[in-house]
Amino acid sequence: MRPLKPGAPLPALFLLALALSPHGAHGRPRGRRGARVTDKEPKPLLFLPAAGAGRTPSGSRSAEIFPRDSNLKDKFIKHFTGPVTFSPECSKHFHRLYYNTRECSTPAYYKRCARLLTRLAVSPLCSQT
């Protein structure tokens, strides 16, 4: 490093600015006291919506984007499984699976539900005559 000139004001100004700055401005607060100081300070908002932007409430918007179809579940599962029939002995297991599981009640899992239903249809329990 080069030696500084005797009359250089830059390091003195830097040290003065560093000494006068708030405690939390140097990086992470140290200890509990620093954490309490930063919690009391108002936090700036990162996003402020524009006034009159014409946004709709999220509930009505989701209803417009995803219209409910009562046969949507049946359409998806019939598309994935194909023609699947269940014997009368197996109807209890079918109803338990179709109406009471997450796979058959959540649209994200309909493909898994279709796989479970086809495995149930070809299982030895349901294929007995």
From Swiss-Prot:
Cellular component per GO?
A: extracellular region; extracellular space; plasma membrane
Tell me one GO molecular function of this protein. Answer: transmembrane receptor protein tyrosine kinase activator activity
Q: In which tissues is it expressed?
A: Widely expressed with highest levels in thyroid and moderate levels in stomach, trachea, small intestine, prostate and brain.
As for subcellular location, the record says: Secreted; Cell membrane
Biological processes annotated in GO: cell surface receptor protein tyrosine kinase signaling pathway; positive regulation of ERK1 and ERK2 cascade; positive regulation of ERK5 cascade; positive regulation of neuron projection development
Disulfide bonds, which pairs?
C90-C126, C104-C113
Which residues fall in a compositionally biased region of kind Basic residues? Answer: 25-35
Please give the residue ranges the record annotates as the region Disordered: 24-63
Q: Which family does it belong to?
A: Belongs to the ALKAL family.
**Role description:** Cytokine that acts as a physiological ligand for receptor tyrosine kinase LTK, leading to its activation. Monomeric ALKAL1 binds to LTK, leading to LTK homodimerization and activation. In contrast to ALKAL2, does not act as a potent physiological ligand for ALK.
Protein's recorded name: ALK and LTK ligand 1
